[in-house]
Amino acid sequence: VLPGDTKPFHHYEDEIKHLGIDWMSGAKTELQKEVDSWTHSKKKLAGLLLDQSKISGIGVAWGSEILHHAGLRPDLKTCDQDLSGLVDSMIHIREKVKKEYSKQFNLSIKNDELVSFINKWFDNLYAIRTMEVYKKGSKKEVLGRTWWLS
């Protein structure tokens, strides 16, 4: 699939229409405009950041990195936090992700393991993971980070 080529995804046209700004390619001004609209929201920041209809492409892992880099808490209401550095953190993490994937891609070509790399990358993206169920308000520690579940 080439960037911008949605033909293989024609089954998902209705879902694609409802996606927000693409985090990986969205302009800083677009991202800033969206984040500015959250300023008075009483929703938790993590919920807005992971809402694919607002900004698409940010999952739990990248969302965690973005919030950590910005020094923001996912469990607090958006209106109770200073979001001034959020977009810069989004762009910083985005560039870091692109750089790492490019590096891994180039290494795989040099080592003649392109097929293996693509298969591992695809499996990581779509791997079926077991999920634990936690009660609302419970706390989960993962790799030194605390997650408050709502």
Residue ranges and their predicted role:
Residues E95-S150:
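C-terminal accessory segment of soluble enzyme catalytic cores
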Residues V1-L72, D80-D88, L143, L149:
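Phosphate/anion-contacting hairpin/loop surfaces
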Residues S41-L45, S56, I93-Q104:
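Short secondary-structure junctions and interdomain/linker hinges
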